Design a protein with these regions (language model features):
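Conserved GTP-binding G-domain of TRAFAC-class P-loop NTPases and closely related GTPase folds
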Residues: 94, 114, 193-235
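Acidic, metal-coordinating catalytic cores used for nucleic-acid/nucleotide bond scission
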Residues: 161-170
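Short catalytic-loop micro-motif centered on adjacent basic/acidic residues
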Residues: 158-162, 186
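Divalent metal-dependent phosphate-bond-processing catalytic cores, especially two-metal-ion Mg2+/Mn2+ enzymes
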Residues: 1-90
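Glycine-rich phosphate-binding P-loop
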Residues: 92-112
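Conserved substrate/cofactor phosphate-moiety recognition/catalytic segment
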Residues: 105-158, 193-197
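Conserved phosphate-donor/acceptor-positioning beta-strand/loop module used by diverse small-molecule
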Residues: 180-199
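Short glycine-/polar-rich loops that comprise or flank the Walker A/P-loop
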Residues: 154-155, 180-185, 226-230
Length: 235
């Protein structure tokens, strides 16, 4: 509560967890401790509940007037929490997010997405570059960004088809898309573990198990604060 941007951090937390359960956990943790400042810590927990109630996120997610208002609040400096920005997007970018073998290509086909697709895998195959060749990753991403810019300049909706498994990776792309006036929708895809592994083995360009393990360790599931819209397609 005493940290910078405490309101913003609290509201973000409320979109991820039930704040009343968070307080319950903290209270139980403190009562189980043997320490001199137990009363002070218990008082801080009670103040946390008051703070949540003041910000209208006690036992519920903080609500925003629109998805765009939520995105603006978490991405703009010193933004007013109840500000409702004017929505005038030039195009919409659908960013897929998911580990290799989770069915991103199948999702594009089954969803009937009649728009261009910027695919990092397609670029790698075109230039015969291995997905495990880290030295080529930068080149592939730059080519994909240039392709994306052609659609952004024209105001053309498109799909960005890549793993996008870390928040930092997504943020860099979202900043680019938003600079061109695009609305960004993240679609996160996840299959059961054994289904995922089997689907990878069945792919024409299957990845080694060791590579999948490393990517799984790095996975950061997209949060509602990251884009104008976040969809969880979890089977």
């Amino acid at each position: 509560m005493e940290k910078p941007d405490s309101v913003k951090k609290l509201c973000e937390a409320s979109l991820r967890v039930d704040t009343s359960l968070l307080k319950m956990l903290a209270d139980a943790d403190i009562r189980g401790r043997i320490c001199e400042d137990k009363n002070g810590l218990l008082e801080a927990v009670e103040l946390f509940e008051i703070f949540c109630r003041e910000q209208d996120c006690w036992s519920k997610p903080r609500e925003f007037a629109t998805d765009c208002a939520r995105f603006h609040y978490f991405h703009a400096e010193d933004s007013y929490i109840d500000y409702i920005p004017h929505e005038q997007f030039k195009c919409e970018v659908t960013m897929l997010s998911g580990l290799p073998g989770m069915g991103k290509d199948y999702y594009i086909q089954s969803a009937g997405m009649d728009m261009p697709v910027v695919s990092l895998d397609a670029i790698r195959r075109k230039y015969k570059l291995s997905p495990t060749d880290k030295s080529a990753n930068g080149r592939v991403v730059q080519m994909a960004k240039e392709e994306a810019r052609t659609y952004l300049r024209k105001g053309q909706d498109f799909v960005w088809n890549a793993t996008n498994i870390t928040r930092q990776m997504r943020a860099q792309l979202i900043d680019l898309f938003v600079d061109y006036g695009a609305k960004v929708k993240i679609v996160y895809l996840e299959q059961p573990y054994h289904t995922w592994r089997q689907q990878n083995k069945s792919r024409e360009y299957a990845l080694p198990e060791s590579v999948l393990d490393k990517m799984l360790d790095k996975l950061e599931v997209p949060q509602l604060t990251e884009a104008h819209e976040v969809v969880y397609h979890v089977v």
